[in-house]
Regions:
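Residue at a conserved register position within TPR or TPR-like alpha-solenoid repeats
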Residues: 162, 207, 252, 286, ...
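Generic helix N-cap/helix-start motif at coil->alpha-helix transitions
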Residues: 59-64, 105-115, 144-160, 189-208, ...
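Charged, amphipathic alpha-helical linkers/stalks
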Residues: 31-90
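Structural motif corresponding to the intra-repeat A-B loop/turn of tetratricopeptide repeats
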Residues: 124, 255, 289, 326-328
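Non-catalytic, surface beta->alpha helical segment in thiol-disulfide oxidoreductase systems
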Residues: 4-46
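Solenoid-like repeat scaffolds
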Residues: 54-58, 96-102, 137-147, 182-194, ...
Length: 329
């Protein structure tokens, strides 16, 4: 009904039941509180604000901040029409970023980075945007306040932005800047632990982007990942554990530490109140490793042990789809 994609997603409605905005999970708690307060005080929904910008109208500062912190990745047609392609989305984000007043440095930089990241992931990006996006990226990397405001881009988008915006001979230096930013996030005790754990995953993807296709991280890099994952697993509390394990096993898998990823998931089965989630993850892991029979078995066990009517339908469909794909005979 509400087109929710990913948990947790907070959707703020007006008294008339119109969606004002949706706020992504994952940001640091202080910024989350400020964005939530901004949304609760908002009068106009994000969809209306976008239309106003498209019509050349002036927005209040609070409106721009609401646009900058909207969960665009979880929009699902609530603001942007589902029929528009990624190129059209990029042009929309570019319009928003360009129209945002320069005095609103944080909001403008966030909209610029959203546009640049969307552009970098296009199959055939319009190179007319390259110079401005590279300038914006350099500005963010050079400014600690802008980097902190664009935490998601620092963690997740370093590889794609570096590859799209720079010539191969220039990429190493910018990757090193991203590397230093990510390491600072991991070591920053003022940030929430889930954010710091996701930064480990971002570090892995950044290092892999410098390698030839199908190449693995070095032994020393894998050892570093193992140590950081062990630290993260030991640091989480019971309320954080399920989400943390979901992040950490995928980090191990991305780093080529498949046995460690499997062991983490198997251990999670013994402590989780919803082990079927991790059974499904084990199915995915074995599928990726080419162990089809084991994968189907885990998908089946996930379905058999799942609780709740909607969950059982979801896991049941997942089992059937994978059984047909992996064991067609």
């Amino acid at each position: 009904k509400f087109a929710v994609f990913g948990y947790p997603t907070v959707i703020v409605f007006s008294p008339e039941a119109r969606e004002i905005t949706r706020i992504p999970g994952g940001m640091d708690i202080q910024r989350y509180v400020s964005v939530l307060e901004l949304a609760l005080n908002a009068i106009r929904p994000v969809a209306d604000l976008v239309r106003s910008v498209q019509q050349g109208q002036t927005l209040a500062d609070a409106d721009w901040n609401l646009l900058a912190y909207y969960s665009w990745s979880q929009d699902r047609g609530q603001v942007m029409d589902k029929s528009i392609d990624d190129s059209e989305k990029q042009r929309l984000f570019h319009l928003l970023a360009d129209a945002c007043p320069a005095v609103l440095t944080i909001a403008k930089s966030r909209l610029q980075m959203i546009a640049a990241t969307m552009w970098a992931k296009l199959e055939t990006p319009d190179m007319a945007y390259q110079a401005s996006y590279l300038s914006q990226l350099k500005a963010v990397l050079a400014d600690d306040q802008l980097s902190a405001a664009n935490l998601e881009s620092i963690i997740y988008d370093g590889a794609s932005l570096t590859a799209a915006l720079l010539e191969p001979s220039q990429q190493a230096a910018v990757r090193e800047q991203f590397n230093n930013k990510i390491l600072a996030i991991i070591d920053n005790a003022e940030l929430t632990l889930p954010v710091r754990l996701r930064a480990i995953s971002g570090w892995v993807e950044l290092q892999k982007s410098a390698l030839d296709k199908d190449a693995q991280l070095s032994d020393s890099q894998q050892q570093w990942v193992s140590e950081k994952v062990a630290w993260g697993e030991a640091a989480v509390n019971d309320y954080q554990r399920h989400s943390a394990i979901n992040t950490l096993w995928q980090t191990l898998y991305a780093a080529g530490l498949n046995d460690s990823a499997r062991s983490m998931l198997l251990d999670a089965l013994t402590v989780s109140k919803q082990p079927y989630y991790f059974m499904s993850d084990l199915g995915y892991l074995e599928k990726q490793l080419g162990n089809n029979n084991q994968a189907v078995d885990w998908y089946k066990r996930a379905w058999e042990s799942s609780k709740g009517p909607a969950t059982r339908i979801q896991w049941g469909v997942n089992y059937v789809v994978n059984a047909i794909e992996l064991t067609p005979d």
